[in-house]
Amino acid sequence: MTIAVIIPTFNRIELTQNCLASINLHDHIDQLIIVDNGSTDGSNKLATIALPTNQGFATACNIGAAHATTDRLIFLNNDTIVHPNWTSFTDLLEQPDIGIVGPKLIYPDCQIQSAGIAVDFTRPPGLEAWNLNTNWATTPTDVDAITGACLAITSNLFQQLGGFDTGYWNGYEDVDLSLASIQAGFRNLYDPTATVTHLESQSGPERWTSVTENVTRLRTKWSHK
């Protein structure tokens, strides 16, 4: 099985350089696709695909996926540092009932940042999806959603689900895709045996500009299903 790593970028070239350096140290990947969202700091020079303007996370990832020629896709934030054997979690995709998988995400101080995402629409708006941030699982475990900071899916299923919903702006696209995977009859797994350090939102404040709209879209689309 072949793997493409798709990295959307928007400025903060130093983050991308550090991410790429870690990828080069660990594990073989078959295709690296960097999609730049109209950066002004030279990040476009590192890009496989340089977009003229910032079209957001979902669009950049979908464009990257369209250029992939591999069996598996890993969507990876540029504010991450990968660890040895980090791509091993994608082997779970060989199971026919598995839709989306993700590794353990940790902060630079090694505290857990995400062990998968839980979704509960009975909680107040804005709290319906939250990171499970404790070492609660020691083997691959079912979760509602996987964070888009590092998320793997087969190319076929990504295409079947229609990719990331571009109606979101830099937030909740990952939860949406994960719920679509479950609706299609698949399971989503968190794999604590693979690790990625996530600096979390170091690439800029734009993630927080459309939280209300993103939450409304997620609830409207999924809370009654």
Model regions: which residues?
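Short aromatic/hydrophobic "clamp" motif used to bind/position activated sugar donors
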Residues: 73
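Short, acidic, metal-binding catalytic loop of nucleotide-sugar glycosyltransferases
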Residues: 21-30
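Short, flexible, basic/aromatic active-site loop/helix in glycosyltransferases
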Residues: 120-144
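A conserved acidic beta->alpha catalytic loop
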Residues: 13, 22, 36-44, 53, ...
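Conserved donor NDP-sugar-binding/catalytic core segment of glycosyltransferases
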Residues: 80-119
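A short, conserved alpha-helix in the catalytic core of glycosyltransferases
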Residues: 90, 142-162, 167-195
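N-proximal low-complexity "stem/linker" segments adjacent to membrane-targeting elements
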Residues: 1-22
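Glycine-rich, basic loop-to-helix element that forms the pyrophosphate-binding segment
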Residues: 51-68
